Amino acid sequence: MAIKDWPEGEGPRDKLLVKGAAHLSDAELLAVLLRNGLSGLNAVDLARSLIQEFGGLRSLLCAPKHQVCRLPGVGPVKYAQLQAAAELARRVAQENLQRGQVLTNPDLTRDYLMRQLADRSYEVFAILLLDSQHRVIQFVELFRGTIDSASVYPREVVSLVLEKKAAAVIVCHNHPSGIAEPSQADRRITERLKNALATIDVSLLDHMVVGDREIVSFAERGWIN
């Protein structure tokens, strides 16, 4: 049944305006973005099928264009709408972890890194630069590709830290497999970076590995002394 034929106030847009966005299901929220469906499939049904196809909202919003646009009812325009929504969410997270903010809440850092790095189809190694009071200076993506001990260069990390006058850092990278468990290579990289940063009296506070649903902290495991 077309949404226009639903009882008054039951359509996702009307429900959002009356009750607020928090009262909508994932499919209903997505339907508001999609605006319309296709023949025999209303926007909510289309949204539900997309979520099922990709296994969740996050995977859908992180999927490449060719994977999304190959599905019936989703062309470049709808893909652009979805990407705009995803980018807005990332920018909200960026504002939540803005320059000058003191990192006193580990959950805030985890949420930010999850939004930035989870579900990337490639590995990203990044660094969160902090001042002596552990206030945020900048978040920088340093390396992309296969992250191993040969592809992460401590001298580049040290150079950036000196340039930004950071006093402490948190490094992080994602596992495209979705499994956050650190590898032996991750532990070797961490040790090399810690030793390199120690030569300029900068503290490595943590190395966080981002998976699909969790983040593993080296500091919490006692791997950074």
From Swiss-Prot:
SUPFAM superfamilies: JAB1/MPN domain, RuvA domain 2-like. Pfam families: RadC, UPF0758_N. A motif (JAMM motif) lies at residues 173-186. Zn(2+) binds at residues 173, 175, 186. One of its GO terms (molecular function) is metallopeptidase activity. Residues 102-224 form the MPN domain. GO terms for biological process: proteolysis. PANTHER family: DNA REPAIR PROTEIN RADC, UPF0758 PROTEIN YEES-RELATED. This is UPF0758 protein Shewmr4_3597. It comes from Shewanella sp. (strain MR-4). The lineage of its organism: Bacteria, Pseudomonadati, Pseudomonadota, Gammaproteobacteria, Alteromonadales.
